[in-house]
Amino acid sequence: METMKDRLRVMLGDERLSRLEDARVLVFGCGGVGSSCIEALARGGVGTLVIVDKDVVAPSNINRQAIAFESTVGKRKVDVMAAMVADINPSCRVFAHDAFVLAENLVELYEACLEEAGGHIDYVVDAIDTVSTKLALAALAQERDFELISSMGGAKKIHPE
């Protein structure tokens, strides 16, 4: 029986596919950037995703978010995203945190996500809207020496000063 990973195996080989299957990625934010990123990671064969967002899908999200449909309006983004990942890549483990990421709770939230992922995270993705939280996450990455992939979007912020 053909699986979604057959094409990945042809493209990457067994060793690289195995590395993806063992990868653990933490994504802060399930909005425009985060939902597309999480979808790509799931389709790419990543084995563990830890996702964090406090928002619900709104009608205004439909024009740009992978999880936003008329049928998902009003639902928690992390729940919709987790269901989407399970539908794309059933072997991907998803840990969903319905939490608002702030500079003030970032360390505690990171520690909880790290523990849930088995004490190791390969990459952290910043798909956060607020500049102060982005800065706090960058500082934490430097302090804890983890790989950070950061989107410089700012959600509705034309003049961030």
PLM regions with names:
Residues 94-96:
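Hydrophobic/aromatic anchor residues within beta-strands of the central parallel beta-sheet
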Residues 98-100:
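Conserved acidic residues
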Residues 27-29, 52:
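Conserved N-terminal Rossmann-fold NAD(P)-binding element of oxidoreductases
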Residues 123-161:
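E1/E1-like adenylate-forming module used to activate ubiquitin-like modifiers
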Residues 1-26:
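N-terminal charged helix/coil linker that caps or initiates catalytic domains
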Residues 33:
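Hydrophobic/small residue at the entry helix of a nucleotide-binding pocket
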Residues 104-119:
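Short amphipathic alpha-helix with an adjacent loop that forms part of the alpha/beta core around
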Residues 46-89:
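Glycine-rich phosphate-binding loop and adjoining beta1-alpha1-beta2 segment
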